[in-house]
Amino acid sequence: MSIEEWDAVIKVHLRGTFATTHHAANYWRDRSKAGDPVDARIVNTSSSSGIYGNVGQSNYGAAKAGIAAFTVITAMELARYGVTVNAIAPAALTRMTEDLVRWQSDGEDAPAWDPRDPGNIAPLVAWLGSVESRDITGRVFNVRGGLVSVAEGWVAGPAEDKGARWEPGELGEVIPRLVAGARANSDTSGRTPTA
C-alpha cells in the first residue's frame, strides 16, 4: 500500500466524517448558545474492520476505528448542546462487497429474508435518529441481518502498578502475566474465542 492509498482512504472516511460533524456541531452549538432548544442526532458509520480488525484492510480499518473513537469523544463534547452521537458498524452485501460473498445456491432458491440485505441496517439508523434514542450516546452498534449488539470498545484489563518507573527488564515478567489474564482479542466478527 502506498502513502497515497493510505491517505485517500483516511481522507474519505475519517476526514469526511469529521467535516460533516464539524459543520453540524457548529450549527447546533450556535443554536444552543442562542437559547434555542436542541435535540439533535449524529449517526456515523464505522465498520467491524475498524473495531475488530480485518487482514488486508489496515487503511480502511484504521479510518473506521478512528470513526468509532471520534464518535465516543464527540458524544462527550456535544452532549451539553443537546446532541447525541452514535455509530453503526454494519455488515451487509452491497455493490462493493458482493464479489466477496455470493449466495451459494446448491440448487436452492435464495432465502425470502436475506440477512445480508443492506435494508436490514436502516431500522437501527432510523431509531438512532429518532427522539426515542435521546438517552443513548457515545455508542457503536454492530448490525448484521437481525442482529444488533453494542460494541464494548477498549476497556482497561489486568494491571500492575509498581508505584515507580518500570525498568525494561522488569516488564519481561509482568507483561506476559497481564496478557495471560486479559480477555483474548476478538475475531473479525467481534466474538471472543473460547478456550
Label each residue range with its predicted role.
Residues 2-7:
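Substrate-binding pocket helix/loop in short-chain dehydrogenase/reductase
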Residues 47:
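Residue(s) in the substrate-gating loop at a strand-loop-helix junction
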Residues 87, 108-195:
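C-terminal helical subdomain
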